[in-house]
Design a protein with these regions (language model features):
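Domain-level marker for long, solvent-exposed, non-transmembrane regions
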Residues: 1-90
């Protein structure tokens, strides 16, 4: 079976849905989010605020998730290009 030659938002959504997520707040105003990908590889990101009094956990997690999605695009884009370069993609 051949792979397609491009990624779409739906592909990244499907990958993200399969990730296990852990969220930490190691210090006031700091958020760390890690995703364990379907293949077992782990990626992580962190965000922080200037004043811990104005810290909003959901904003911190949201920023990290956006950055992690960007990482998915890069990682899976690279993997697809590798397959495409070998002639395995459509």
């Amino acid at each position: 079976m051949k792979m397609k030659n491009k990624l779409a938002n739906e592909d990244i959504d499907a990958i993200q849905a399969q990730c296990l997520e852990k969220v930490w707040e190691p210090f006031p105003g700091i958020t760390i989010v890690a995703w364990n990908l379907p293949n077992g590889f782990t990626i992580s990101d962190q965000s922080g605020c200037i004043d811990p009094k104005s810290y909003d956990r959901e904003i911190g997690v949201g920023i990290c998730r956006e950055h992690l999605r960007d990482q998915l695009w890069k990682l899976y884009g690279f993997a697809l290009k590798e397959q495409f370069g070998r002639g395995d993609a459509e």
